[in-house]
Amino acid sequence: MKWKYLYIWLIGLLAIGCFDDDTTVDTVRISEIAIDTNSLQKEYNRDKNQTLVIDITPYVTQKEKDLPLTFQWDMDYKFYSDSSVLYVDCQDLGTFPMRVKVSNEHSSAFYEFKLHINSPYEEGLTVLSESGDGTGMLSFMRQMADGIMGNFETHCLTMNNPGEVFPKSPTDMAKRLSQLFISYKNDPSVYVINAKTFELENIVKAPEFSDFLPVAMMLPDNAARTAVAISENGKVYNLASMEGLILTHTTLTSTYSSVQHSYFGGYNPYYYLWDVNQHTICYYNGYTANYCQEFGPIWNGAHEVIAIFENEKKSSFTVLTELNGEIWKTSLSNTIYKLNENYQKIGVDYRDVQRVIANPVLKKEDPKVASSSYQCLFYAQGNKIYRWYYSSTSFPTESWTVIDDISNAEITTMAISPDESQIYVGAYRSNESGENGYIYIYDTRTGQLIDSYKNVAYKPVKIMYKVK
């Protein structure tokens, strides 16, 4: 009988253990968190000065019941915000790893992504222009990621430098790595602009040189520390681009034309300037100047330079000069001289010398751009563009193309794309006020108009395709 009662007592204990008891066994329903990352982007792109906004709450779910949530946003592995909505004022360029941690009292979930803060001026067509009263303007049309061009943005300098007053009479523009150099004749100076943000970084002036009025710059797009700045009177100054100084040039001491040509190959630059006193080419390699007189003068007589441009890519160049109303073409190797096996000069390395019949007459002031790929020179007079092939002994009598969609158009500057497939043309109408500048893009091979942009600048001074 005692065993009977013992069995009943044990069964009772087991029955008690069947009741719910949260204190001994964890049977509470866990409210797990999930983030619908498939509905969110892995990468976000924003331009500088734009804002990234992400409200994470619509993408968060809790499995059992809604519990209070906490949020932690990290940017570049550092705490950024504890709000449910992320706001990033995009100022610093670059790519930043991002993460949000969403938690309740039971669990946490994570969402990771990348934020790319890009320059709105990374790569594209850049136009420097001047109004009737000399006011300068920088316009920019962006190259989009898919290869197509965007729309022109005007007044880029004033917009990105509030309160800064820029000088009048801009004369030239050149890029060196991450910087854009713009020269001004009024209040003579060179302004150094960040090429990606168009923010002012430095102002280079030389009040100690009263005749410093920069009209052209020969500036390599590399890590070179110095460049050539040609003043209005033909005097050359040394532009120390890294230090931001204007110095007297101790090698180029003559008087030079603003017509010049340069390219940068290997370790040394190749500068070709025209000495207006000696009527000859001066070849400057960054260290020494050579006036090409070792075997007698290359040009007999008082030739005046009209154009200097590349002939065969990184191999030869051509000089067009005028003498007594006639135009002469002289093509030389980049090194000017023939060398023997001991690298001694043995004579002038002429590639071609001939008289060119000029109709219409080509002038030094005519906007020009050369294409070594197509072996031709494009030049403009009024609203007409002409194409002259290097092999021809006469200039064309008929235009290659004409700007005829607007009246009274005058072409003021030309440039060519880096791959030489497109010609960029800047024109303006003097009888139109305000933003009276027009940009045209032509196919280099066919002359077909690819696109045109109206009222996107003042009178164009310089046009260039700015690469990254």
Question: Residues of each region from the PLM?
Answer:
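Repeated scaffold domains used in trafficking and secretory/extracellular systems
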Residues: 159-177, 207-226, 248-270, 293-316, ...
